């Protein structure tokens, strides 16, 4: 009795403190996505567990595609009439997720929604999952990312595995084309819905270093029937027989990909539906697959889920569009070789002139080790000399980025270093050509803030 009374007081004070902190920070014009949760957890360390009770929760984790997959799922839930909230501001650590639950709950700790859609950082997932009894866990993929923070891919995979071990009641939605992700089925008892793509996406794709070239069981080199990107595709081990499992939700045909969208055919249990995916890029086809798998777990009709893919709003910085100085600007977050090469795959389809900008930071959220840029096939852009008008580099490590482009073969006079974000946008849009900006995470936040203030767009958290 005394414990329950004490816990109720702690919950009340923690939620109150969180709401007050969030409101104050927003009044000051800041994001306030993480700090309010840290304050709340100081008062009540178990706050997330108390607030998440009785809330049907789906968690999305993995290296690439978490935010976009979450936005796709969000649209399908909206169209299906589900009452939910989501951490769409990108606060995906324990403190940020706790803050989202708190601001969507009453002061007594009662959530105002029946469902929650939570994007979780892959390293934070094992902590978040201790407090949230998820109905489903969506694992997008596992790639090498921020070596100083995550270590090698097997370490990231272990973090996800531990998180799923905490999620004993969850159905797993797992990428069948990722040999690392698919291996989770071998070591965990959870039911699994596999998703994947049955065919190559690009006929002329960027050649990449594989993050998982060897069998996770016996260490023999994989043989691929086809590759979609990175180490994803139709893998099989000729030594022990480990191979890509047959996905329940899969793309059977890629009908078309262009600058604006992709058209595909989805199949689930023998039933096929066409879908137009509102964002371009092969990696967004995978994100759409993950969304369709999550919809299956939630009992959402396949046609309704497919239709939602044509109308969802992209996450901030994820193929986000702006109109600046009569030029179309598209911002595409990058953070590792696999994701960056996928952006290059997208760009190499262009036949019209454009301006390219890369903004490289080395803060904790970006990864302090920026050596990964040397594993990206920027040389591929040289083949686009006729349509690539100018290259701009910016950010804390702009000089490193400029050096990388020099080694890729671009003449020095074509590489413009501009560390001031406002001036960068003015110069890059000066020719009125389409501009494609590739920033790392903290560069994206800073650049996004500059665009909001200077050109009248909303802040990322609004």
Over which residues does each language-model region extend?
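Adenine nucleotide phosphate-binding catalytic loops in nucleotide-utilizing enzymes
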Residues: 3, 193-337
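ATP-dependent carboxylate-amine ligase
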Residues: 2-26, 31-33, 219, 232-234, ...
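Fold-independent oxyanion-binding glycine-rich loops
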Residues: 63, 88-89, 119-121, 141-142, ...
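Buried hydrophobic packing segments
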Residues: 73, 77, 97-101, 288-298, ...
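Phosphate-binding loop of NTP-binding sites
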Residues: 2-196, 204-214
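Residue-level signal for inorganic ion chemistry
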Residues: 140, 173, 287, 291, ...
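Short glycine-/acidic-enriched loop or helix-start segments at secondary-structure transitions
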Residues: 70, 126-128, 148-149, 182-185, ...
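Conserved active-site and cofactor/substrate-binding residues in soluble primary-metabolism enzymes
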Residues: 34, 55, 68, 92, ...
